[in-house]
Amino acid sequence: MNQEKNREPLGLNGLPSHDYFLDAVNHIDQAVTNKSIAIGAAKGIIYSITETLGSMIGDPDLPSHLRSAYEGALEVAHELEAKIARLN
């Protein structure tokens, strides 16, 4: 069943809500748990997500409310990255 979530659309600055990143991390977490993704692929995707979030957080023009939300998403991604590393 596909449930519609209330997500913030792209903001006026063109940046996505942190929910999109959290959804991606949760999707990879579920795939790893269900063993429906190769560990190497999961590592690569999570690496890309953490690098993207890190770059966005490093932007000095990023509004503080977005920075805080992205930092939270980055922390969740780092936790999954550590979980995947323990599986290897």
Language-model region placement:
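Long, low-complexity or tandemly repetitive, helically biased scaffold regions used
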Residues: N2-E8, S55-G58, S68
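Charged, low-complexity interaction regions
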Residues: T33-A41, G58-H65
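N-terminal acidic leader/helix
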Residues: N2-G40, L80
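Short, charged, amphipathic alpha-helical segments
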Residues: K43-Y47, S64-G72
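A structural signal for well-ordered alpha-helices, especially hydrophobic packing surfaces
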Residues: I28-V32, L53, I57, L74-A85
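Short E/K-rich amphipathic alpha-helical oligomerization segments
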Residues: A41-D59
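Short intrinsically disordered terminal tails
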Residues: M1, I84-N88
